[in-house]
Amino acid sequence: MATKFQKDLQKYAELAVRVGLNLRPGQRLLVRAPSPYGVAFEHAALIHYISEAAYKAGARYVDVIWGDEQTELIRFAHAPRDSFAEFPHWKLTAPLEYAERGDAILTIAATDPDLLAGQDPDLVNTYQETVWKVMNPYLVHGTSNTMNWCVISAARPGWAKKMFPKPDEEKAVANLWKTIFQMCRVDQADPIAA
């Protein structure tokens, strides 16, 4: 039997797909993160509910760009400095293809806010400038509304502890999920109608 959290997470996914994206039958769906790291593996349950909701709404195909922030930290610690002016173009290809086809893109904004704290600011700046330069052809589609797109959030320990510093990490994450669900009316009997 599903827990209350699992039921709320499922309603959140359905809300994102049906209302946020207004996914149409036959569209493909790409789920990604706003950062180049990809969607954190810890959000697999949410991704599963999103995929199910998308297919039930008539999605032709659902794809996810997964990632691992710790791998990026390892890069900052050990990669050659001149490598930060490089960015793999395949990370542009997928979202650009979806955007050009008029498909749907769901972005899960849940990056650790302190991930790059303590890193060389010049490297961070070079890295961010490179990412924005490469990703610009895709970003233009979002600002010109040529595709269905939506940004949602998901609770992560870093953000949870910033918003709820007093309780332990697990309780802070639970509080952040509760807040996200309340803000999106997931706590209502019918969040889609709310």
What are these regions (language model features)?
Residues 1-194:
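Active-site bordering "gate/hinge" segments
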